Amino acid sequence: MAAAPGVRRSELGDALRACRSAFIGVGLMSCMINLLYLTGSIFMLEIYDRVLPSRSIPTLVGLVILAGGLYVAQGILDLIRGRVLVRIGTSLDEALNARVFDTVVRLPLMVGGRNEGLQPLRDLDNVRSFLSSMGPGAFFDLPWLPLYLAICFAFHTLIGLTALVGAIILVTLTIITEFMSRAPAREAMGLAARRNDLAATSRRNAEVLVAMGMSGRLTKRWSEANEKYLSGNQRASDVAGGLGAIAKVMRMVLQSAVLAVGAYLVINQEATAGVIIAGSILSARALAPVDLAIAHWKGFVAARQSWHRLSRLLETLPAHTPPTLLQSPSKRLSVEAVSIVPPGDQKIIVQDVTFTLDAGNGLGVIGPSGSGKSSLVRALVGVWQPLRGKVRLDGAALDQWSSDVLGRHIGYLPQDVELFA
């Protein structure tokens, strides 16, 4: 499917669209599962309205065998649907993990220390975990709510109205859950990221912290950050858990209300005894997806926020375009009026440097600490992009080279060697 002119396609959206056939399969299985969910209601209706009045054992045996077969089919379909959703999450991860890892590596070279660290990888885990959970199944089941309500109305108008009122209450609770859980969940995830960044920074600088006696103060700062995270996570969990508990209670109240309405109709000879049980089972099933959606709403909110962060990140750092295939450099290094600003900074620390170095020659760069020697070297090997000017090898600018190809011809030893440490 081609994108419309002027419309920018999302990499996340493309990865999800690649699973379109799997989602269609999940939708078809959800259709069959929800039709099979009618088995219990119809079974009870037949038991009370046919088997008991006729006292027919063969009819009872036939109904039990038929219902058992339908329940087995429903269980198998539910199992397959769950496994397909797990594989959709895995497929999305496989399509994006290399790209997300690339952004984790490249982002510090663009924004310096003010980056998201490993958060993009955690975001991808959040999206995959939600897609692999029971949450998406609940959303696939929600569109079948009107069918169940229509059957309740077919039993009797009062039963249908009772189920409809319960549905309105639970859907309202779902909307309230969305508005009340969005901010606490976002706050909790931000606090978790800050806590993890502080722990990672402390680990990288362990020698300095111990040598200068700062480990106690950093531990105190981390404990304060952790307490804020725990408090925020508790608020988010309280909102989701509280509304989820209310939803469960309301579903049980609704089930009892349907039983009471059914009993009233039987007493007034407006319905049969089977309608009491069948209506109760059907109304409970109608609202089960709403109940399940509320229970998984916290995970949905977290996955949605992770999705938005990943989308912004991948748009900020587009994928590398295949560079021009060039011959191995062998003649000359040219630096043309290069000025350098460190990533995430505004101050120029190397300005208008120009020199040429032919093959076989060497050059030493000396100067006081902080004068920009390391910054110049980072630009010479392509780690940092110059603010102005060009660095060329055999006439080709460094950004025309593939880093994988160029790296074979460059030796680079940074001040802090931490690779695979």
Sequence positions of predicted segments:
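Juxtamembrane loop-to-helix connectors within ABC transporter transmembrane domains
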Residues: 26, 44, 102-147, 204
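Cytosolic ends of transmembrane helices, especially the final helix of ABC transmembrane type-1 domains
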Residues: 86, 214, 238, 286-313, ...
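Hydrophobic alpha-helical segments in the permease module
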Residues: 66-78, 166-169, 240-254, 273-295
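Transmembrane helices of ABC transporter permease
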Residues: 30, 63-70, 137-187, 260-271, ...
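Extended non-transmembrane interhelical loops and adjacent amphipathic helices
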Residues: 2-9, 86-129, 196-197, 212-232, ...
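An intracellular "coupling" helix at the cytosolic face of ABC transporter transmembrane type-1 domains
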Residues: 16-18, 109-110, 123-131, 135, ...
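ABC-type nucleotide-binding domain
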Residues: 327-421
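Membrane-integrated ABC transporters
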Residues: 1-38, 53, 57-61, 81, ...
